[in-house]
């Protein structure tokens, strides 16, 4: 994230879960979630940034219970005698199968919102329901369980263990979940194959390109079969060509597996791949923008909304 000017605002640091935080507490939530029906054709849109063609997956129908239901969310940090209001009553709903970008300038509160949605922090006020369960006031152990079962994290810096293979990096969350060695290897191989690295199992991070390292990180995020992925600037360390490949991988996970994917990003090109962009400013949702799918069905829906 970019540094803020003037007073340092803590919300611009997304807290990355420590290794211990990945340990699994007793079962609380059932991570099984039905895939939304994806019957519409893909829509080809033009990037708002450079005019290149982007294939955008049509948004699923917003039916049933939201995966994420944030209502009047507030977060205040105390710094000496000064209070910093990172969130001032933000409200948003995200439904199963959506691919959403959260954008805003430095100090807007978007990273604080991401931390709370990712169960890495708790709000000072308001309610956050994850799959219908109020997680706003859960204990650290139960939040750790939700992180390990329900949420896959992908960060800009990859966060791979440098001395271990791609396979071992992907297996790591299963070690803390108590999964047997044979099952760990089987699931890690499947996860790496899913992201196109089935032939790189024994390679260490320094033997992989930046794009391949991020694919390993995505495979690790998928290993516990989460309900959603939270990605913080996932293409920030990648060149343009590799960024496009990674975003297309995210799209395939969204389209083919019904994965709910949420990005925090400064990059308009990353947002262009999403179906929806939530703009945060001064701790509030300033605008919730549904991007137009240029397939005939997508255009028909856009006209209906208007």
Annotated model-derived regions:
Residues 2-64:
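Pre-NBD coupling/linker segments of ABC/ABC-like ATPases
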Residues 9, 46, 54, 83, ...:
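Polar low-complexity intrinsically disordered regions enriched in Ser/Thr and small residues
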Residues 16-18, 41, 51, 57, ...:
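Coiled-coil-like amphipathic alpha-helices with heptad-repeat character
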Residues 284-306:
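Conserved beta-strand-loop-alpha-helix hinge in the C-terminal portion
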């Amino acid at each position: 994230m970019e540094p803020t000017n003037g007073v340092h605002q803590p919300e611009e640091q997304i807290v990355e879960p420590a290794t211990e935080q990945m340990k699994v507490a007793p079962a609380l939530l059932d991570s099984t979630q039905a895939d939304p029906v994806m019957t519409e054709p893909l829509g080809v849109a033009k990037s708002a940034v450079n005019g290149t063609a982007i294939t955008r997956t049509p948004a699923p129908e917003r039916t049933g219970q939201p995966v994420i239901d944030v209502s009047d969310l507030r977060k205040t940090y105390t710094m000496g005698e000064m209070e910093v209001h990172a969130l001032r009553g933000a409200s948003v709903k995200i439904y199963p199968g959506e691919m959403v970008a959260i954008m805003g300038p430095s100090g807007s509160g978007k990273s604080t919102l991401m931390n709370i949605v990712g169960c890495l922090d708790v709000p000072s006020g308001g309610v956050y329901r994850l799959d219908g369960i109020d997680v706003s006031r859960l204990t650290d152990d139960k939040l750790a369980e939700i992180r390990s079962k329900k949420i896959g994290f992908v960060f800009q810096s990859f966060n791979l263990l440098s001395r271990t293979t791609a396979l071992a990096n992907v297996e790591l969350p299963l070690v803390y979940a108590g999964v047997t060695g044979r099952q760990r290897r089987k699931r890690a191989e499947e996860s790496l194959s899913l992201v196109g690295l089935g032939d790189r199992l024994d390679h260490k991070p320094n033997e992989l390109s930046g794009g391949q390292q991020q694919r390993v990180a995505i495979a690790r995020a998928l290993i516990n079969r989460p309900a959603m992925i939270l990605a913080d600037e996932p293409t920030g360390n990648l060149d343009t060509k590799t960024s496009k490949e990674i975003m297309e991988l995210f799209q395939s996970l969204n389209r083919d597996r019904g994965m709910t994917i949420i990005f925090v990003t400064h990059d308009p090109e990353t947002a262009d791949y999403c179906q929806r962009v939530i703009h945060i400013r001064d701790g509030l949702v300033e605008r919730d923008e549904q991007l137009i799918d240029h397939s005939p069905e997508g255009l028909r829906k856009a006209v209906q909304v208007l």
